[in-house]
């Protein structure tokens, strides 16, 4: 075990950063859909498709989770991941359609710039594309991916990961 989320079989992580804008993207995905859960807190949480991660959701799985800087602009990263998954034929099957299920959350890491586009493509789409191509069972912690521009008022943040094995119990109810 590497004490990373990728210790869970089938989970891969990809990261990409843009040093010019002090922002980044982290993607969790894999060859198959996986089960995840969410607890959204705060009054201004920037999220997309987190409802499908709630325990009462009828779907119960996702094709990817995208964590991004960029505040609301960063939600664009999940659209790129959804496009890439669709190109691979992945997604929730509805009749003749596939709908890749991508949940995402963003942090505020914007610096002094209002030009977050290259050739009319948002930098978060570009970063998502790079991160998706970097999917691996090994990734760096700290100021990488979505954690690249993370900070509080006075303390630099980053991304972390951990894993733990829990022995499953068999319960019999009589």
PLM features: what roles do these ranges have?
Residues 39-59:
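Glycine-rich oxoanion-binding loops at beta->alpha junctions
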Residues 63-64, 70-143:
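A generic, well-ordered mixed alpha/beta core segment in the N-terminal half of proteins
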Residues 4-7, 15, 38-40, 94-95, ...:
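General beta-strand structural signal in soluble alpha/beta enzymes
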Residues 2-3, 12-17, 53-56, 90-92, ...:
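A generic local secondary-structure boundary/capping motif
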Residues 136-158:
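Intrinsically disordered, low-complexity linker/loop segments enriched in Gly/Pro
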Residues 172-174:
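Conserved small/polar residues in nucleotide/adenosyl-binding loops
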Residues 1-40:
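N-terminal amphipathic/basic leader segments beginning at the initiator methionine
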């Amino acid at each position: 075990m590497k004490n990373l989320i990728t210790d869970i079989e089938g989970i891969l992580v990809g990261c990409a950063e843009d040093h010019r804008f002090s922002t980044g993207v982290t993607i969790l995905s894999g060859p198959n859909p996986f089960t995840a859960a969410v607890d959204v807190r705060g009054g201004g949480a920037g999220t997309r498709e987190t409802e499908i991660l709630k325990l009462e959701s009828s779907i119960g799985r996702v094709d990817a989770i995208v964590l991004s800087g960029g505040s609301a602009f960063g939600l664009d990263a999940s659209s790129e991941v959804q496009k890439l998954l669709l190109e691979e034929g992945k997604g929730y099957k509805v009749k003749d359609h596939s709908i890749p299920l991508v949940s995402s959350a963003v942090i505020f890491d914007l610096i002094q710039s209002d030009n977050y586009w290259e050739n009319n493509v948002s930098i978060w789409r570009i970063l998502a594309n790079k991160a998706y191509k970097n999917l691996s069972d090994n990734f760096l912690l700290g100021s990488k991916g979505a954690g690249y521009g993370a900070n509080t008022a006075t303390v630099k943040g980053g991304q972390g990961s951990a894993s733990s094995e829990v022995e499953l119990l068999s319960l019999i109810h009589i």
